[in-house]
């Protein structure tokens, strides 16, 4: 007897291998934002940890958006997984996450 089983092929999903790279880029952006927190325009009037709380809240919103944008980009445009492309996608997600901070913060004021 033959059984008809459906095979899930991960090579068809072009966006799947790049999710980890975009997440690493977002973590790099969070690290840079925390390191340069004093130079970012977030006021410290609410206490010492107010700036870190604002950074974490904004990044919890921007990280899924950035990962979805990178996944959509990789799904539409087939980007082979080479080391140069991985580094560029990591930098792109880092830049988008930092840009998301500067876009989202004035709206939340």
Swiss-Prot record:
TM spans (from-to): 16-36, 52-72, 87-107
Subcellular location: Cell membrane
Claim: Cell membrane is one of the keywords in the record: yes
Principal location class: membrane
Annotated membrane topology: Multi-pass membrane protein
Superkingdom, taxonomy of origin: Bacteria
Keywords from the UniProt entry: Cell membrane, Membrane, Transmembrane, Transmembrane helix
UniProt GO cellular component terms: plasma membrane
Protein name: Uncharacterized protein YpfK
Gene: ypfK
